[in-house]
Amino acid sequence: MNPYVEIIRPGNVIMAIIAVILVAILAKSVDIPIILAMLAVFFAMSAGNVINDYFDYKIDLINKPQRPIPSGRISLDNAKNYAYLLFILAAIVGFLISCLVDTWIPCTIVIFSDIILYLYAYKLKSTPLIGNLTVGFMTGLCFIFAGYTFNEGLIIYESYLLAFFALIMTTAREITKDIEDMEGDMAEGAKTFPILYGPKISAIIAISLIIIDCALCPLLYIYHIFNINYLIVVSIAVLIFLYGAVLLRNQDSKTANKVSKYLKTGMLIAFIAFAIGTFTITF
């Protein structure tokens, strides 16, 4: 894979774009502003991933030596300039969206996101729990951003509900990833939550968040946000989440890596459930 494509972490970026697509499905509408919203999310999230690798290159020499910067396929200067370009492109697209929908909220969200993504990579990531919550918050913000792109009350309300779900599960996954990366983080002197308070307490928090999200999933059906088809499909995601929670009783790096992948898979299935639950489909 081309290193400039690899460094943006296409899988993570696609997950963020899916958030925008899901809100479009909820609204049953696809127009120019929502297409631009996908583009803005692509640029902003890509920039965040690149600048994160820029600041993390020493840690990645231990944890992820195959990544573009530690492997020498992209220089530090090129990575930094690449990130800045992507941040600027995101802001430009955000400005265009605001002009089209006649509200400055989308542009404000994009600029705010650019700043938070940079601060996360520079400082917040190493702040215990705050860094994890920041990633969860940014994931949820993708839904809210899409909601304001439509600028309709009901869609905005529903986007906040989806954002809350994404915030909790993403935070759980980020804590799990910190458990996985403890060796490299300790070598670099990072003060992540698992390093300061231990992997066991960290796992308890992650498991608790997973259980909370699983308990909340039926509410989106009970309160008629989604139909019965959502409940059927999201049940699969819930089983995957709970299986990951059970595995996390063992906090070694290999298990944490496996759980992180399970949570990511479960979130993708949950997103599919959100989409299916919007339409009347007979299985």
From Swiss-Prot:
PANTHER family: CHLOROPHYLL SYNTHASE, CHLOROPHYLL SYNTHASE, CHLOROPLASTIC. It catalyses: sn-3-O-(geranylgeranyl)glycerol 1-phosphate + (2E,6E,10E)-geranylgeranyl diphosphate = 2,3-bis-O-(geranylgeranyl)-sn-glycerol 1-phosphate + diphosphate. Its EC number is 2.5.1.42. It is found in: Cell membrane. It is an enzyme of class 2 (transferase). It is a multi-pass membrane protein. Pathway: Membrane lipid metabolism; glycerophospholipid metabolism. This is Digeranylgeranylglyceryl phosphate synthase. GO terms for cellular component: plasma membrane. The chain crosses the membrane at residues 5-27, 37-57, 85-105, 128-148, 152-172, 203-223, 228-248, 263-283. Belongs to the UbiA prenyltransferase family. DGGGP synthase subfamily. One of its GO terms (molecular function) is geranylgeranylglycerol-phosphate geranylgeranyltransferase activity. It comes from Methanobrevibacter smithii (strain ATCC 35061 / DSM 861 / OCM 144 / PS). Its main location: membrane. InterPro entries: DGGGP_synth, Prenyltransferase_related, UbiA_prenyltransferase, UbiA_sf. One of its GO terms (biological process) is glycerophospholipid biosynthetic process. Keywords: Cell membrane, Lipid biosynthesis, Lipid metabolism, Magnesium, Membrane, Phospholipid biosynthesis, Phospholipid metabolism, Transferase, Transmembrane, Transmembrane helix. Prenyltransferase that catalyzes the transfer of the geranylgeranyl moiety of geranylgeranyl diphosphate (GGPP) to the C2 hydroxyl of (S)-3-O-geranylgeranylglyceryl phosphate (GGGP). This reaction is the second ether-bond-formation step in the biosynthesis of archaeal membrane lipids. Its cofactor is Mg(2+).
